[in-house]
Amino acid sequence: MFGLGGQELVLILLIVLLLFGAQKLPELAKGLGKGIKEFKKAQNEIEEEFNKATDDSSSKEKKETKA
């Protein structure tokens, strides 16, 4: 995962804990999870639009070559 080992992840978590406090961590994790979910949703929508566009253009080319 991004070239980080276990020790690096623990260190990052400790720093986050010190900066934000234990009470804010669940709220931060929830916000991060929502952000990742929205990012993946947008990524999937872009991929679907790209696939539709490439499928449409390839089907038009096939129709033109048949005519």
Curated annotation (Swiss-Prot):
GO terms for biological process: protein transport by the Tat complex. Keywords: Cell inner membrane, Cell membrane, Membrane, Protein transport, Translocation, Transmembrane, Transmembrane helix, Transport. The keyword NAD does not apply. The chain crosses the membrane at residues 1-21. GO terms for cellular component: TAT protein transport complex. It is found in: Cell inner membrane. Its main location: membrane. It is a single-pass membrane protein. Forms a complex with TatC. HAMAP family: TatA_E. Belongs to the TatA/E family. Part of the twin-arginine translocation (Tat) system that transports large folded proteins containing a characteristic twin-arginine motif in their signal peptide across membranes. TatA could form the protein-conducting channel of the Tat system. NCBIfam families: PRK14861.1, tatAE. This is Sec-independent protein translocase protein TatA. The lineage of its organism: Bacteria, Pseudomonadati, Chlorobiota, Chlorobiia, Chlorobiales. The gene is tatA.
